[in-house]
């Protein structure tokens, strides 16, 4: 990625007008950046639990498989609305506690509220009148959905100000800025590994015996215990960072321009003047996320439903089989995060040798193949159950094959989290556009496809029998198309 690196080293960090950026006299010490970046571990711990456990959990509460994807709509919606809005207002916050710390503290408190609503949804629903033998626990689902949406809003409230705080601490130093973001990414990987490890441990509820209740079985209690650990970690890291790291109070300069175009006005205005290279980048990014999102939504559900043959709406034996698959799926996600972290360390070296767009195109082929291979793994698991019996666990070969797919997918996921943003920076630098504005436009190419998938993947799966494979196949096709587009039209 020599072209990217050269432009990053040559170009100064984008300093916006004095109305939105406070630049300290000099960069803060590395230990303060580490303290702020460590909050990412707490954020990502909870996000890992969301990805691995919450889709199966809401089905255990009675929400049909085909409708569960609609609950995930808040993620892309809040990414589209909340994060840029919070960023816009945190740039202009005049609180005596600083610009970033009030938003980070608010986000952490919202996470705590959301975790209580999600973890105790079954208990709250039972207290409010849900019967234990009801197929759909309406009140519990209501508490869950409210908590789930609050959690997505809270995560977006936290992440933007945390990254902005790191930018403030870097004080415009390009090397410090790259280092701070690398540390943030490292702690994201740490949080992922911890979250998926916790989600794959089946006896976590024994640490918190009060989590098992009449309305909350062992799977539910494990989820509740995971979230208790998650919020404890986040609150501790947040308190340490906000106490230890100073966030200077901001006040606008007397000559600053207070009649600025609002953030969304800038975003939509950018589309009018956007040049072809950026449009092509948006197209590849959108196709890439259409490929990824069905798997991110239903990866552990696939393991519990198709690979292990369980059923979240079945009898106790089928539920136990399903939950077993979910736990193994969480292990797969942990392996995915480990590979992602390792791959993130070598992206720069590989990109320098073959180029960013070739690397992105190549790993999208890997993504397409892995998503297509889920069909083969599923068919092998079904054939095994026909021979060994409906309740038979998958063979070691089938289980290891599924886990291998999770691990290998860490390679293209690492590229998805880095190359598009690097290319957006290059294009914006060459065209004279602002870095923040270009990344805001790129974010729309991520969240809008996620909303499309959230609306469409459940009904598509239901149309073809109610499993997860149709969505994965659509993802494989989108990944293949994105690979071709990346290799042929990206600059």
From Swiss-Prot:
Annotated SUPFAM superfamilies: MFS general substrate transporter
Reactions that this protein is recorded to catalyse: sucrose(out) + H(+)(out) = sucrose(in) + H(+)(in)
Keyword Ribosomal protein in annotation: no
Topological domain ranges for the Cytoplasmic compartment: 1-33, 90-101, 161-181, 246-277, 351-358, 428-443, 490-491
Pathway listed: Glycan biosynthesis; sucrose metabolism
One GO CC term, this protein: plasma membrane
Residues with Phosphoserine modification: 17
Keywords assigned: Cell membrane, Membrane, Phosphoprotein, Sugar transport, Symport, Transmembrane, Transmembrane helix, Transport
Subcellular location: Cell membrane
InterPro entries on file: MFS (IPR011701), MFS_trans_sf (IPR036259), Suc_symporter_pln (IPR005989)
Tissues expressed in: Widely expressed.
Domain of life: Eukaryota
Basic and acidic residues compositional bias, start-end: 1-12
Modulation of this protein's activity: Inhibited by protonophores (e.g. carbonyl cyanide m-chlorophenyl-hydrazone (CCCP)) and SH group inhibitors (e.g. p-chloromercuribenzene sulphonic acid (PCMBS)).
GO BP annotation list: flower development; glucoside transport; maltose transport; regulation of flower development; sucrose metabolic process
Alphabetical list of NCBIfam families matching this protein: GPH_sucrose
Family note: Belongs to the glycoside-pentoside-hexuronide (GPH) cation symporter transporter (TC 2.A.2.4) family.
Designated name of the protein: Sucrose transport protein SUC9
Species name: Arabidopsis thaliana
């Amino acid at each position: 990625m020599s072209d990217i690196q050269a432009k990053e080293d040559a170009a100064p960090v984008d300093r916006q007008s004095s109305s939105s950026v406070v630049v300290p006299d000099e960069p803060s010490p590395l230990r303060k950046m580490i303290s702020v970046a460590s909050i990412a571990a707490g954020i990502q711990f909870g996000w890992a639990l969301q990805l691995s456990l919450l889709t199966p959990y809401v089905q255990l509460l009675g929400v049909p498989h085909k409708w569960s994807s609609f609950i995930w709509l808040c993620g892309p919606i809040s990414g589209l609305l909340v994060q840029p809005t919070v960023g816009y207002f945190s740039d202009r916050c005049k609180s005596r506690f600083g610009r970033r710390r009030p938003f980070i503290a608010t986000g952490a408190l919202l996470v705590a509220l959301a975790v209580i609503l999600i973890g105790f949804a079954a208990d709250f629903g039972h207290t409010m009148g849900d019967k234990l033998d009801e197929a759909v626990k309406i009140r519990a689902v209501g508490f869950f959905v409210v908590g789930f949406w609050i959690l997505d809003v809270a995560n977006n409230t936290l992440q933007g100000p945390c990254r902005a705080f790191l930018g403030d601490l870097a004080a415009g130093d390009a090397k410090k800025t790259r280092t701070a973001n690398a540390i943030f990414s490292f702690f994201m990987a740490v949080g992922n590994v911890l979250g998926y490890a916790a989600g794959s441990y089946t006896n976590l509820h024994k640490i918190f015996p009060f989590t098992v209740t009449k309305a909350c079985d062992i799977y539910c209690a494990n989820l509740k215990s995971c979230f208790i650990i998650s919020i404890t970690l986040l609150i501790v890291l947040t308190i340490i960072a906000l106490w230890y790291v100073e966030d200077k109070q901001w006040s606008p300069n007397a000559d600053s321009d207070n009649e600025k175009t609002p953030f969304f006005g800038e975003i939509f205005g950018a589309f009018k003047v956007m040049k072809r290279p950026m449009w092509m980048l948006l197209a590849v990014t959108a196709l890439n996320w259409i490929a990824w999102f069905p798997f991110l939504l239903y990866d552990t559900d696939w393991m519990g439903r198709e690979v292990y043959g369980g059923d979240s709406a079945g009898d106790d034996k089928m539920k136990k089989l399903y939950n077993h698959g979910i736990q193994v799926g969480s292990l797969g996600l942990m392996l995915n995060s480990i590979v992602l972290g390792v791959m993130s360390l070598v992206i720069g070296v590989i990109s320098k040798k073959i180029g960013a767009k070739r690397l992105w195109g190549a790993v999208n082929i890997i993504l397409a193949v892995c998503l297509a291979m889920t069909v083969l793994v599923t068919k092998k698991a079904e054939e095994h159950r026909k021979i060994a019996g409906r309740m038979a666990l998958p063979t070691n070969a089938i289980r290891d094959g599924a886990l291998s797919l999770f691990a290998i997918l860490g390679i293209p996921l690492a590229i998805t989290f880095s190359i598009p943003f690097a290319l957006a920076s290059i294009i914006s630098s060459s065209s004279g556009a602002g870095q923040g504005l270009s990344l805001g436009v790129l974010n729309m190419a991520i969240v809008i496809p996620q909303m499309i998938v959230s609306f469409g993947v459940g009904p598509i799966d239901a149309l073809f029998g109610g499993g997860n494979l149709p969505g994965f196949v659509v993802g494989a096709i989108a990944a293949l198309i994105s690979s071709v587009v990346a290799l042929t039209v990206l600059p």
